[in-house]
Amino acid sequence: MSIDAGRERILCRLEDIPDGCARGFLPVDRDDRVFVVRRGERVHVYINSCPHNWRPLDYAQDRFLSASGSEIVCYAHGAHFSIDSGECIAGVCIGQFLIPVPARVDNGMILIARELPQPPE
């Protein structure tokens, strides 16, 4: 595994997230909440903040996906987002995007950017 320690950090093992599921994280020593959606060997990582009002998307721990598992859902106002792009495709913030976090899988580990993007204030 090759980690650029100045730019990346290990979030977790890929196997810690079942395929087709999502999991939320509070990175160590950070106030930034992120969540990961796993699709096979690929992951999509976003800041856990809805662009409608910049509040967390999940109503309960790790509840980020629609019942079918095909979309990310903000349970506060019912906005639906594409897993692949983070774009709101239904609800109060159509056309707005979740904030993506640079991430990759290397040797079974999920690596994310050390410096995370921030939602607007």
Residue ranges and their predicted role:
Residues 1-67, 82-83, 97-121:
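N-terminal pre-ligand scaffold of iron-sulfur
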Residues 50, 74-77:
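Short cysteine clusters
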Residues 64-73, 88-96:
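Short cysteine/histidine-rich metal-coordination sites, predominantly Zn2+-binding motifs
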Residues 81-82, 90:
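Short beta-strand His + acidic residue motifs that chelate non-heme Fe in jelly-roll/DSBH
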